[in-house]
């Protein structure tokens, strides 16, 4: 699974069609999602932060004037890491980028105050990734993920209209996975 995801992202997904559809549907949910994200991200100020993925920090952290003590961004794709590094060249936030699998994080236990990501968990073996997130999260730490949901009718439509914009192993989250987060 990890190798298939890595290859798909290194080779580049066909996101043009997805972005055209997304432009016409995003107003239905992005404003509220972005407000929730911004409110929650204030917790990351001055904290040790881990992003699963290596792109969202630009919009979520840098563009909102959040300054974590340390920001580590992981990705299994070297191409995605390179994109994150390009974004960081002119940023006041200087993330540390790591080519790393979220199923086996190479960080010490209880290393991070805050772990977040955008549209990443649905690419992973959910339970394995969640175990690793909990392992590296400090007691009292927080997690925040914005993920596609299998129950979202707009998301379903976008997925049907843009099958080549995703990998074979992607699976939108359902209520079952969300309730596991509460544990």
Locations of the language-model features?
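A conserved beta-strand element that flanks and buttresses the S-adenosyl-L-methionine
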Residues: 116
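Short alpha-helix
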Residues: 170-183
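A short glycine-rich, Lys/Arg-flanked "PGG" loop and its adjoining helix->strand segment in the class I
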Residues: 128-142
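Class I SAM-dependent methyltransferase SAM/SAH-binding core
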Residues: 50-104
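A short His-aromatic
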Residues: 119-123
């Amino acid at each position: 699974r990890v190798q298939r995801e890595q290859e798909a992202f290194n080779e580049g997904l066909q996101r043009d069609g997805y972005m055209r559809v997304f432009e016409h549907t995003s107003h239905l949910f992005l404003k509220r999602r972005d407000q929730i994200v911004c409110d929650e991200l204030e917790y990351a100020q001055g904290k040790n932060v881990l992003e699963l993925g290596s792109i969202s920090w630009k919009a979520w952290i840098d563009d909102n004037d959040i300054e974590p003590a340390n920001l580590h961004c992981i990705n299994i794709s070297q191409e995605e890491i390179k994109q994150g590094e390009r974004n960081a060249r002119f940023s006041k936030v200087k993330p540390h980028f790591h080519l790393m699998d979220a199923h086996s994080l190479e960080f010490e236990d209880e290393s991070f105050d805050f772990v977040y990501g955008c549209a990443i968990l649905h690419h992973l073996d959910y339970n394995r990734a969640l175990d690793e997130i909990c392992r590296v999260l400090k007691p009292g730490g927080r997690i925040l993920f914005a993920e596609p949901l299998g129950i979202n009718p707009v998301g379903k439509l976008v997925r049907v209209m843009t099958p080549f914009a995703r990998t074979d192993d992607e699976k939108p989250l359902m209520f079952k996975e969300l309730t596991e987060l509460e544990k």
